[in-house]
């Protein structure tokens, strides 16, 4: 497809998640949504029972403000949090824009900073951020952190280097697989 919606593997999407991203997609923009979180007890129960009906009222959901779906006021927040670093757990963009920045920088090890590097390079390309608050709701399942401090330190150095040099197209990305 021409449009990519990206999530993490440890989230539960609201039933309108995909529809919300598609309805907000505009040329020249990438979209960023927020996420609510699920505590450990509720996460275990959901994974055992397989019943994923959640809302901001569900006991065990926190960051409840991020679990509110209010599409009629979402557009008021499109330019909200313009300076905040994005995360890759709830982001969408045009495939052509992803290819122009050479996708994710594969010099990153594990996770950490790779998902803020991509949107930073999209911005340097001239693609603007649109925040989709109160739409594209997702719930992050509780788990222990997997990244090591060494990986995070290495990744932070790569991210800072990309920023300092104004890198738009990363040196090791998706092109190596499609050329």
State the predicted function of each range.
Residues 62-93:
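A recurrent flexible, glycine/aromatic-enriched loop bordering the glycosyltransferase active site
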Residues 10-12:
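Acidic metal-phosphate-binding loop of nucleotide-sugar-dependent transferases
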Residues 96-100:
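Short, well-ordered alpha-helical scaffold segment located
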Residues 92, 102-110:
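Conserved nucleotide-sugar donor-binding catalytic segment
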Residues 4:
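Short aromatic/hydrophobic "clamp" motif used to bind/position activated sugar donors
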Residues 16-53:
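Conserved donor NDP-sugar-binding/catalytic core segment of glycosyltransferases
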Residues 107-179:
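C-terminal catalytic/acceptor-binding lobe
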Residues 7-8, 34:
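Active-site acidic Asp-centered loop
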């Amino acid at each position: 497809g021409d449009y990519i919606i990206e999530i993490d593997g440890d989230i539960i999407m609201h039933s309108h998640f995909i529809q919300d991203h598609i309805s907000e997609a505009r040329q020249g923009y990438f979209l960023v949504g927020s996420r609510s979180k699920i505590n450990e007890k509720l996460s275990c129960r959901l994974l055992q029972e397989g019943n994923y009906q959640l809302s901001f009222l569900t006991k065990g959901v926190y960051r409840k403000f991020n679990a509110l779906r209010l599409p009629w006021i979402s557009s008021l927040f499109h330019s909200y949090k313009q300076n905040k670093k994005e995360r890759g757990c709830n982001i969408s963009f045009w495939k052509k824009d992803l290819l122009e920045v050479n996708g994710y920088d594969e010099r990153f090890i594990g996770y950490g900073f790779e998902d803020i590097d991509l949107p930073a390079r999209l911005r340097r390309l001239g693609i603007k951020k649109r925040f989709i608050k109160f739409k594209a709701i997702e719930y992050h399942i509780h788990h222990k952190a997997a990244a090591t401090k060494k990986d995070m330190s290495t990744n932070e150095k790569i991210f800072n280097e990309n920023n300092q040099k104004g890198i738009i197209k990363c040196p090791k990305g998706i092109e190596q697989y499609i050329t």
